[in-house]
Design a protein with these regions (language model features):
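Sec-dependent bacterial lipoprotein signal peptides
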Residues: 1-16
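Sequence signature of WD/YWTD-type beta-propeller architectures
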Residues: 18-401
């Protein structure tokens, strides 16, 4: 029982970042440095076969389908946005802030970057030039200010014309006019003598056609996903089986959002499909007493198959601090025809970014199980081709155009 409680506590702490988007962000200074130093001290990091090689697959001129954006430390130890070019070798630092970049997103049109740092929303061109201050939230001096004045969670519209961001609620910044439209106001209760966030709103990800936005509805502890339709300014809440987090993706036609959780604690593991009407289909259940179905990073491939990472734990008592995950492929229900694409599970996965065509996934793998942010970024192919190392550390990975 003690082992089970300890494991649940570790997984709960790992999940807090995705379910409490309005709390004061934890300091991330030197995260990359710590990881890099730890990796240098290790002789090997556990990862499944096949082993890495040093050349792109034959017949291709570039290793990556698009430039890869990610966070890594600068020389001063602050997290900044970097870009790895399609050759898989050339790295350029994009932001140069005197503090950590906390959240960011990349324009799908021209590769420019919108990001938050020092409670400001900023914009730079694809090469890091022409830094522009869009919103200044000012100092955060009280509990209430974090719910009413914190600038965070950025999402760029597919047409590149609008930036959705959190700032006392859900806001839209029009790049052509500079106008800001707040469509949902955070609900803060100060009657207990302290500020308690009853309900707060921030963007997660636009649907491919730009008609709707997956948003976080955050509470004092925890939160859920919901859909916001731009036409009609309509908020669609998830009803029964509301999804709380974590990594996921829209279907190409925007009819549904697949979400998955590899965590256990304040939230449950599982795999869900959020339909356009807000109805949630539970595909894999992670409720007690088990089996517990852990899942992460689902994506619907162009072949109509669902690709994700998965592990089924028969009994809750068998849980470890970090659950290993297999790369799998299945029908859209997450169950039918489910096949492991690698013979061994992956350990200590902190982040997964799929190629748009699901031909490979970039994994950020931590060198130790108690590191929960970022890691060594490496490509693992769904067809069993040799894996490819990219950069020593990456966090919050995004594709550029």
């Amino acid at each position: 029982m003690k082992k089970l409680l300890a494991a649940i506590l570790v997984l709960t702490l790992a999940a807090l970042a995705c379910v409490t988007p309005f709390a004061e962000p934890a300091s991330q200074t030197n995260v990359g440095t710590v990881v890099a130093q730890t990796m240098q001290a290790l002789t090997a990091v556990a990862s499944p076969a096949p082993v890495a090689t040093s050349a792109p697959p034959s017949g291709t001129s570039d290793l990556l389908p698009h430039p890869l954006y990610y966070l890594n430390n600068d020389s001063a130890g602050f997290l900044q946005v970097h870009r790895l070019e399609m050759d898989g070798k050339t790295v350029q630092q994009i932001t140069f802030e005197p503090g950590n970049v906390e959240t960011y997103d990349v324009s799908p049109v021209d590769g420019s970057v919108a990001y938050t740092s020092n409670n400001q929303l900023l914009l730079v061109e694809v090469d890091g030039s022409d830094r522009l201050l869009l919103v200044d939230g000012g100092p955060l001096a009280s509990d209430e200010s974090y719910a009413t004045s914190r600038v965070g969670n950025v999402a760029w519209s597919p047409d590149g014309k609008t930036i959705a961001f959190g700032y006392g609620g859900l806001n839209f910044y029009a790049l052509d006019t500079g106008a800001i439209n707040k469509v949902l106001e955070n609900q803060v209760d100060t009657t207990p003598g302290i500020a308690v966030l009853r309900e707060g709103y921030s963007p997660k990800e636009y649907a491919p056609d730009g008609s709707k936005l997956l948003i976080n509805i955050g509470y004092y502890e925890g939160g859920v996903y919901a859909l916001y339709y731009l036409s009609g300014n309509t908020l669609i809440r998830s009803g029964e089986n509301a999804v709380t987090c974590c990594e996921g993706s829209w279907t190409p036609d925007g009819s549904a959002y697949y979400a998955a959780s590899p965590y256990l604690g304040m939230i449950s593991p599982g795999l869900w499909r959020i339909n356009a009407d807000g109805k949630v289909d539970t595909l894999l259940d992670g409720e007690f007493p088990g089996p517990l179905e852990f899942a992460q990073a689902p994506i619907l491939g162009p072949d109509g198959q669902l690709y994700f990472f998965h592990y089924s734990l028969p009994k809750a008592e068998d849980i470890a601090n970090r659950t290993p995950l297999y790369m799998v492929r299945s029908e859209t229900d997450g169950v039918t025809g489910r096949t492991n694409l690698y013979p061994e599970p992956f350990e200590n996965i902190n982040e997964i970014l799929w190629a748009p065509d699901a031909s490979f996934a970039i994994l950020a793998i931590a060198p130790l199980e108690n590191i929960f942010q970022g890691g060594k970024a490496e490509i693992y192919y769904t067809d069993g081709s040799p894996s490819m190392p990219l950069v020593p550390f990456a966090q919050e990975m995004r594709w550029g155009p």
